[in-house]
Amino acid sequence: MYRAVTRQIEVTVEPNFVPEQSSADRSRYFWSYTIVITNSGEETVQLKTRHWIITDATGRQQEVKGEGVVGEQPTLAPGERFEYTSGVPLSTASGFMTGRYQMVSESGERFEIDVPTFSLDSPDNKRVLN
């Protein structure tokens, strides 16, 4: 599990290789990842946007930006958590992802929180990147 804490908001990530949706013969590798966001602060916050940088084993990067996560812009009161699962394909047997969420506090302040860099490794991978 990978973990980052920004302004008392914890983000954990658990990636999993999905062999049923992968094919080494077609250079298609797929991972799911489960993210848990926990608000340990004293103020209610809302996740507004996401920004991902996805890097494959050759160093090729893909940038993904968008509103919310999995179609939601969750609001987390102090002590609350939000969990979701999504997925990512790569054309190489390994890679990694890193990112940030833009949050807004109940007072209207916008700020970013880190998503920890996490490794995407398949059984076909000969070395671990992160």
From Swiss-Prot:
It comes from the Bacteria. Transmembrane segments: none annotated. Gene3D superfamilies: ApaG domain. GO terms for biological process: error-free translesion synthesis. Pfam families: DUF525 (PF04379). Residues 3-127 form the ApaG domain. NCBIfam families: PRK05461.1 (NF003967). This is Protein ApaG. It comes from Bradyrhizobium diazoefficiens (strain JCM 10833 / BCRC 13528 / IAM 13628 / NBRC 14792 / USDA 110).
